[in-house]
Regions:
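Conserved N-terminal beta1-alpha1 strand-loop-helix module at the mouth
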Residues: 1-89, 95-103
């Protein structure tokens, strides 16, 4: 239904329980959801990401992780949204991963 929409989260703006809101958004079938909860530690984010991933997967909606590359890896997610500053910081790691993927 919303194939050209990428939803971006902010659980502080949700008027209903956050995971319930994620289900409602997934029901609308967006292209993807970016889990952009910038105030969480990586540990807190990982726990929430796993819960959200279980929901998005059941609706066949792609989940995009924000900033935390290790969380994306743990969940088997290959799309990460981040600032240009962070991208520059992880640049070598990205290049190495692309080279491994493409057998370069």
């Amino acid at each position: 239904m919303l194939n050209d929409v990428i939803a971006v989260t902010n659980r502080k703006l949700s008027q209903r329980p956050f995971l319930e809101q994620i289900k409602r958004v997934c029901h609308l079938r967006p292209e993807a959801i970016i889990l952009r909860e910038k105030d969480l530690s990586e540990t807190e984010y990982a726990k929430l990401a796993e819960e959200v991933y279980n929901i998005t997967t059941s609706y066949d909606v792609r989940l995009i992780i924000h900033t935390y590359i290790n969380v994306a890896r743990e969940l088997g997610i290959n799309t990460v949204h981040m600032s240009l500053h962070n991208m520059r910081e992880y640049r070598k790691e990205f290049i190495d991963n692309v080279n491994k993927t493409n057998n370069i």
